[in-house]
Amino acid sequence: MPILPSPNPPVEPYKIRMVEPIRLLPREERLRRLREAGWNVFRLRSIDIFIDLLTDSGTGSMSIYQWAALMTGDEAYAGARSWFRFRDAVRDVLGLDLVLPVHQGRAAERILYGELLRRRNARIVPANTHFDTGRAVILNQGGVPLDLPSPQASRREAYPFKGDIDVARLERLLKERSRDVAFILLVITNNTAGGQPVSMDNVKTVRELADAYGLPLVMDICRFAENAYLVKERDPRYRGWSVRDIAREMISYGDHFVMSAKKDGLANIGGFIATRDPSLYEDLAARVVLEEGYVTYGGLAGRDLEAIAQGLREVVEEDYLRHRVEQVRYLGELLSSQGVPIVEPVGGHAVYVDVLEALPEMPRSHYPADALAAALYLESGVRAVGLGALAFAREENGEIVYPEFELLRLAVPRRTYTNSHMEYVAASLARLLREGRRKVKGLRVVKEPRIKGIRHFLAELEPIEPV
């Protein structure tokens, strides 16, 4: 398999001290596994995956300092030392005082979003673009998630901050229906729109609009460090700032926060809710006790709190972030140079293939992003994830409304794979699209869950044509 070399591949700023064997199953075996999984890559076993780019959430490698911190975990039910170290790390790195740990990000979304929807007695939640779990949480609590991506987000040409919210559309919504809006949400970085960063100017403008209409501004900050690094890289005004200072500046404009520590906490599990409102904090704390655990552990072991505390301090180190962003960019450059259409510029955690351009002949009703994900696994053993019609299409007035984007996401776990893994992925996908478009078979849904917004996780599919 030809691999296109790069003149400047990124150099890993770490040594490998422990390894996990991986193996590439024969194609016939991969086909059998795919059939058993209902042609849904979420349902595959990890031992049957050669290179796993399904998600960067909780799948990265921890540092020796995080492993050492695990051994100091205090497992007391209440008031554990590990809780105080976790709290202090959130304060020091992010500048947030009122924090509640939870077992992962979607628990934070469920508790915070549910409380805000009840308090405002309003349903609409505008966002730069909702990600799948947050969207599902809002839908299943009676809310209406509304995507207002930047006009530049859907354009192929590079633009530094495609993750922004469309301020003009947001302002128009607030002028017409502010009473129906529960809160404004910024997802940082904007995962669904290609892992793109949100600019500081956009955050400041949204803050002004929130103040003008008396609305809370909520931030999903699970990739706060990657966003801050990209601001430093793409906005000349912040070139001399540290990543930590940029992150704290951006976070200073928010009211309430959700965080999955499985991303920029560099941990395998965990998350938190934070707020600036003491009254809301008390109500959220009660919900955490009811649904997650006591307020000083929130469903996590003390050792997990220790790993997150250390991870939050490591994630703002610029040597780490430079390699993180450059490795993902390297994968993007390899794909683009071989003719694979991707969202540009490449964001912080993943490369997104524009499937509508890659497979223009396939109708949206055949779920092209997920069809490409299945074909990529079958032909190479690589697992990626489709983010398109299967995940985000909805029925409205008896008709199917398809999302603006149909993307294949190649999410790179942190500190886990090397450049040669990226080269294998790029060569495999480029070959599939160059030589084997006929191998990408459209899919139909055989079975799906009744709960809204999660069918791409659990659906069983089958090819429309024989494989």
Swiss-Prot record:
Reactions the enzyme catalyzes: L-tryptophan + H2O = indole + pyruvate + NH4(+)
Entries under Pfam families matching the protein: Beta_elim_lyase
N6-(pyridoxal phosphate)lysine: modified positions: 263
EC number(s) on file: 4.1.99.1
Keyword annotations: Lyase, Pyridoxal phosphate, Tryptophan catabolism
UniProt pathway annotation: Amino-acid degradation; L-tryptophan degradation via pyruvate pathway; indole and pyruvate from L-tryptophan: step 1/1
The keyword Lyase is annotated on this UniProt entry: yes
Molecular function in Gene Ontology: tryptophanase activity
Enzyme class label: lyase
Needed co-factor(s): pyridoxal 5'-phosphate
Top-rank taxon, per record: Archaea
Keyword presence, Nucleotide-binding: no
Family per similarity comment: Belongs to the beta-eliminating lyase family.
Annotated protein name in UniProt: Probable tryptophanase
Lineage: Archaea, Thermoproteota, Thermoprotei, Desulfurococcales, Desulfurococcaceae
